[in-house]
Design a protein with these regions (language model features):
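A short core secondary-structure module
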Residues: 147, 151-183
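A short, Trp-centered hydrophobic/proline-enriched beta-strand micro-motif
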Residues: 117-125, 169
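Short, solvent-exposed loop/turn elements at beta->coil junctions and helix N-caps
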Residues: 60, 126-130, 155-156
């Protein structure tokens, strides 16, 4: 990409922000993770509708195909403008696992909803008595035919009250050493 192409892209990003980052949305963004789901979804939808929601995803799964410089331009411009943070759990954590390791059925079921923001995810790592010491996880997933039965607790789960789904680390092998047997 030439420097004039990058300059044009930067102008496009600034114009987009000027059009979609309203004063009320900018004020809501100052709350960080405290932003309401409705406000978070409004910004997510605007970025999604522009085709810019997943700059780190492969194009075949809905990514932008941007260069590192384009990603930097977008990231810097939205941060400097005080735009809401796109909730990272689906786009940055769950989506890449699904498009890399998921079945075609899982990709079809989850990736479009992560991209369009209609489903929000949260992470389930910390547990009572173990905090973020993942080797001491007690929540277990026990195989029951084709399914797993999960039993345990998670705490300190950022945005759990706004999420539709949780991705959780669970112990699937109780015989393994503590650092292993976690899925």
């Amino acid at each position: 990409m030439t420097s004039s192409d990058l300059s044009a892209f930067e102008t496009e990003v600034h114009n987009f922000i000027g059009e979609h980052l309203t004063p009320d949305l900018n004020k809501a963004a100052s709350l960080g993770f405290g932003i309401s789901r409705a406000d978070g979804e409004r910004w997510h939808k605007a970025v999604y509708n522009q085709g810019w929601i997943a700059p780190d995803w492969p194009v075949e799964h809905g990514g932008t195909g941007w260069s590192l410089r384009q990603k930097q331009i977008f990231s810097n411009a939205t941060a400097l403008a005080g735009a809401p943070m796109i909730m990272p759990f689906g786009l940055d954590m769950v989506g890449p696992v699904i498009y890399t390791f998921g079945t075609d059925e899982q990709k079809a079921a989850h990736l479009p909803k992560i991209l369009d923001g209609s489903v929000w995810w949260c992470q389930g790592y910390s547990e009572p008595g173990s905090g973020s010491d993942l080797a001491s996880l007690k929540t277990a997933a026990v195989r029951d035919g084709d399914d797993y039965v999960v039993n345990g607790q998670k705490i300190w789960t950022t945005n759990a009250h706004k999420a539709d789904w949780i991705f959780a680390l669970v112990r699937t092998d109780t015989e393994a050493k503590p650092q292993s047997g976690i899925s």
